[in-house]
């Protein structure tokens, strides 16, 4: 790249679903010579995670408004105004060529500050239903991108940027053909676990016995109780962990996944090429349900709403899927994936920054 390097500011925070896709795009552009800084909040996961990836981070003070009491609601305009002022000072100091909003509380004041400073804003919506912040910012953004169809009526569908180690996995036909033995079931409820999965899956193991083998991520603080449940039903042979560090290895091992349907999880499962049983978290706007719908419609997954999620239903479903069926579902999942999502988002940032 000739001349002065282009500068990107990424606005993302709160959860891995916002932060990890932002990191994927940041690393891609850094490899092309771009300078990248991050806008976040000091009390959320980005504060520790982003610097570990070699990216400097600036902080503003902002928190969510949903579900807060009357006093917090009344003080919200003042808090937002202060956050916008902080973000404007950061933008003027760094002078980015373009700002990427990936969602989270920080994107609202950050996006407004960028717009007030005349800096173009590119939004990326990870979920099938747009979040409140992105719905508002879409009015002032230069470009709106979406991972799944339907979040915004006219936005380009580019997928979710996912980790390179997941994209590097062998295709389903290479990975799954020739496998024998029990069906390998990977159970993941996110880094915090999911109580309904932890309570139900040991009972599924009891019903299916040696027809399946499990690798179960239970989440922080749940390991002892879940191990006790497996012991109670005589199923101590399964691999149970508080947290799985190498998700690519877990996806490579699995024949099928049982999990929540957060945006990043759904996108990783599609990129890996895996069948899934999705149990959407019960959001008011059914965000996780709509994330999972494209894979269910493609014949690659089954959605079980939480009130209907029980050991009998799951055991019957898994027992009905033989290896040829699982391979066909895996290939359908991979066909839905958008493996070049990172490149698509980066290309739009390059275009807007010219």
UniProtKB/Swiss-Prot annotation:
Family annotation (Pfam families)? Glyco_tran_28_C (PF04101), Glyco_transf_28 (PF03033)
Q: Which reaction does this chain catalyze?
A: di-trans,octa-cis-undecaprenyl diphospho-N-acetyl-alpha-D-muramoyl-L-alanyl-D-glutamyl-meso-2,6-diaminopimeloyl-D-alanyl-D-alanine + UDP-N-acetyl-alpha-D-glucosamine = di-trans,octa-cis-undecaprenyl diphospho-[N-acetyl-alpha-D-glucosaminyl-(1->4)]-N-acetyl-alpha-D-muramoyl-L-alanyl-D-glutamyl-meso-2,6-diaminopimeloyl-D-alanyl-D-alanine + UDP + H(+)
Where is this gene product found? Cell inner membrane
* Enzyme class per UniProt: transferase
The UniProt entry lists the main location of this chain as membrane
Look up the domain of life of the source.
Bacteria
Pathway the protein contributes to:
Cell wall biogenesis; peptidoglycan biosynthesis
Gene Ontology annotations of biological process type? carbohydrate metabolic process; cell division; cell wall organization; lipid glycosylation; peptidoglycan biosynthetic process; regulation of cell shape
Q: Name one GO cellular component term.
A: plasma membrane
The EC number(s) attached to this protein equal 2.4.1.227
Membrane-topology descriptor: Peripheral membrane protein
The keyword Cell wall biogenesis/degradation belongs to this UniProt entry's keyword annotation: yes
Concerning InterPro entries, the annotation shows:
GlcNAc_MurG, Glyco_trans_28_C, GlycoTrans_28_N
What does the record give under GO molecular function? UDP-N-acetyl-D-glucosamine:N-acetylmuramoyl-L-alanyl-D-glutamyl-meso-2,6-diaminopimelyl-D-alanyl-D-alanine-diphosphoundecaprenol 4-beta-N-acetylglucosaminlytransferase activity; undecaprenyldiphospho-muramoylpentapeptide beta-N-acetylglucosaminyltransferase activity
What's in the keyword line of the UniProt record?
Cell cycle, Cell division, Cell inner membrane, Cell membrane, Cell shape, Cell wall biogenesis/degradation, Glycosyltransferase, Membrane, Peptidoglycan synthesis, Transferase
Record-annotated residues binding UDP-N-acetyl-alpha-D-glucosamine? 15-17, 127, 163, 191, 244, 263-268, 288
Q: What does this protein do?
A: Cell wall formation. Catalyzes the transfer of a GlcNAc subunit on undecaprenyl-pyrophosphoryl-MurNAc-pentapeptide (lipid intermediate I) to form undecaprenyl-pyrophosphoryl-MurNAc-(pentapeptide)GlcNAc (lipid intermediate II).
- HAMAP family, A to Z: MurG
Alphabetized NCBIfam families for the sequence: murG
Family the entry assigns: Belongs to the glycosyltransferase 28 family. MurG subfamily.
Q: What is this protein called?
A: UDP-N-acetylglucosamine--N-acetylmuramyl-(pentapeptide) pyrophosphoryl-undecaprenol N-acetylglucosamine transferase
Q: Which organism is it from?
A: Serratia proteamaculans (strain 568)
